[in-house]
Amino acid sequence: MKYKHLILSLSLIMLGPLAHAEEIGSVDTVFKMIGPDHKIVVEAFDDPDVKNVTCYVSRAKTGGIKGGLGLAEDTSDAAISCQQVGPIELSDRIKNGKAQGEVVFKKRTSLVFKSLQVVRFYDAKRNALAYLAYSDKVVEGSPKNAISAVPVMPWRQ
């Protein structure tokens, strides 16, 4: 019993700095007689470590009885688009390359083993941030991925 509490506590601590998505909207793709329809969901999140960068992710969400109960596994299909929405402030850790590949967003896409992740890279040569969206599993991930780049530009007032 102690181990369950320890694992749960560590999991919550590790997920703390990740961004939380806000659902912007969705469209139904397949009608289901029982349970919710299959759909494509559009969500937005702000990079938790880079002020004034917002990313939009679209992803498939499985419906039906299993989907309604949270037991279905969503497909690995996703798209991402990130934009500068104000003056960008980069920390020294990001500028020095110590945060390369850092997970900035994670969404569970199956009951236990699968998730959609977004990781950030900083391209110092081009002064740009690159955001990579991909799906992974405990045992095996998917090669499906999407990328969005945000050039770090001066913000006009």
UniProtKB/Swiss-Prot annotation:
Residues 1-21 form the signal peptide. It comes from the Bacteria. InterPro entries: Uncharacterised_CreA. Disruption phenotype: No crucial effects on activation of cre regulon gene expression during aerobic growth on glucose or pyruvate minimal medium or during anaerobic growth on glucose minimal medium. Keywords: Signal. Disulfide bonds: none annotated. The keyword Translocase does not apply. GO terms for cellular component: cytosol. PANTHER family: PROTEIN CREA, PTHR37952. This is Protein CreA. It comes from Escherichia coli (strain K12). The lineage of its organism: Bacteria, Pseudomonadati, Pseudomonadota, Gammaproteobacteria, Enterobacterales. The gene is creA.
